[in-house]
Amino acid sequence: MHLSVRFSTEKELKQFQDLLYEKSGQGVSFTGLLEAMVSEVTIVTAVHNIKPNKGSKTAGVDRMKMDKYLQMPKEELFQLIQSNISNYKPKPAKRKYIEKANGKKRPLGIPTVLDRIIQECMRLILEPICEARFYPHSYGFRPYRAQKHAIRDIVNVINASVKSKDQPVWAVEGDIKGCFDNINHRLLLKKLWRIGIHDKRVLKIISQMLKAGYIDQDLYHATEMGTPQGGILSPLLSNVYLNDFDWYVGRCYMEPHRQCKHKCNDTRRLKWSGITPKYNFRYADDWVILTSTEQEAFRMKHELTKYFKHRMKLELSQEKTYVTDLRKNGIHFLGYIVKAERKRKTPDPATWSDNLVGKPFPDMERLTKKIHTLQKEVRKIGLYTQSNTQAAQIQYVNSVIMGLAQYLQPSICSHAYHAIDRRVNNTALAVWKNLFPKQYNQMQVPLKELSNLPHRHEGYDSKTFAIQIDGKWFGITYAFITHSRYESKPFDQKMTPYTEDGRRRYVNYRTKHKPLPCDRPSINTPEDIALSIYASGKGWKANFEYFMNRE
C-alpha cells in the first residue's frame, strides 16, 4: 500500500496512525513512509515528545542541546530535519556507562539531538505498523503496557487452570547473552520487511543508524552488531527482532492456527494432538515460559537453545536459563517472585482447598539494594544547611518511596513496605539527631499535619521526621500508605493508542470509569499556524519554541 500524506494537524496525524494500525493488522505492507516522517506535523510532535525529557538537556558528540534547535525559526528547523533525513548520515553516539544493580556497568549511547528528533519522527510512523503485528503477551517498551501487566497475566494463567492436572507450575526462565549487543543487522532488516515496512529508503536509514558507531574516550568504534542502547528507535527494533520468537512459541504451543471459534476449544485440540500447552511472557529481553511438567520444561529449554542459535543468531546463557518449580522456589521476573501456593486459609474450614494459585511477591534481594540507595538519599538531607534545600531533598526522597511502593503494589507486599519504612525511619533518626541534637524528638509530627502531600497523608496519625518552614511541616512519607492492589482480571489486550476503542479502554482503566476533568487540546491547530504566519508578515519571526508553546 503506497501512502499519500495528507495531514496538517496533530489530530489528523493520530487518524493517520490509526489507519496504519488497522491496515497493518490486516496484513498490508507499506511504501511511501518517508514522506509521512518528514511532514511538518510529525516533526512538531517529535520535538514536543522529546523536549520534556531530561535527556533533551544532554548533548551528543556535536555538543548541541535541544535549546539550540528550539531557538531556530520553525522554517529553518523543518528544512534542516527534512534535508538531513533525505540524505541521512547519522553521527556516532557518545558512549557513557551507568551502574547496574549488580555493580557492573551498562554501556549507554547518547545520540545527537538532531538524530534523536529524526528517530522520534520515524518511531511515530513505524510504531503503529509494528504494534499491530506484535505478540499479545510481550510487554516491554510498548505503549499502555508495564511490568505489572506481565506479572498479572502470569498469575492469571496459573489461576485459570487451578483445578486441572495440567496446571502450569513449571517454568523456563530465559536469559539471552548480550541480547541487544548481538542483534544481527541483516536479519533485523529482513524482519522489518516481513512486518510490513517495504519503503527501502526507510530501511536504508535504519541500516545507517545501526552502523553509526560510537565515541568512547575520544576513540571511534564501529558497530557491526547490535542496536544502540539509548537510541529512541532501539526498543522498537529490539521488539521487532524478538517478535518471531514470541510467535514461534505462541503458534506452536499456545494458539496453534486458531482453528476453533473459542480459545478453550483450541487448547483442547492442542492437547488431543499430544502437545502440552506452554505460555510465553516477555518483557524486553527477559522472558518466562510456563508449562505443566518438568520434562516439558527441560525439552523446551533444549529446543529454544537451538532455535536462538540457528534462527535468531543469539545465544542462551545455560548458566542463567533456569528450569524452576513454582511450588518450591518461584520464578524471579522483573523484580518479583511468582510462586504457586495454596490459598490462604479462612476462618471457615469448609472453604479450605488444596488447589494452587499464583502469588506474586517482591524480590527482596533486589529491593534491599534499592533501599540502600534510598537510604543514601535520606542521608543527603543532613548535608544541607538551608531549610529550603532540605525540603527539596525530602520531596525527592518521597518521590522515590512512592515510586517503589507503586511498583510493588500488584504483589503481596506489606512486609516489603514495612522494610522500606523501617530502614528509612532509622536512617532519618540518625540524620535528625545530627541536625537537631536537642530537639529531634519534637521534629516528629503526625503525617496528617504535614503540608506536603496532604491528600496522601490525610487521616494518618503515624509520626514521621519533618522540618518546619514558615510554620509549615515538610516530612518524609511512608510506603505503607500505598495499599497493595491485586487485579484479578487479565490484561486487556485491546488497549492500544491506535484505535478509538483502545484509547477509551485505557482511559477507563486509568480513571476507573470516572470522567476526566478536562481534555488536552491539539498541540498544533490551524489557529496556531495562522498566528505564526501573521507574525512573520509583521516583520519578525517566532522561533520554534514559541510556535510549539501556542496551545
Which role does the model predict for each range below?
Residues K211, Q217-Y220, M312-N388, A392-Q395, ...:
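A conserved non-catalytic segment of reverse transcriptases
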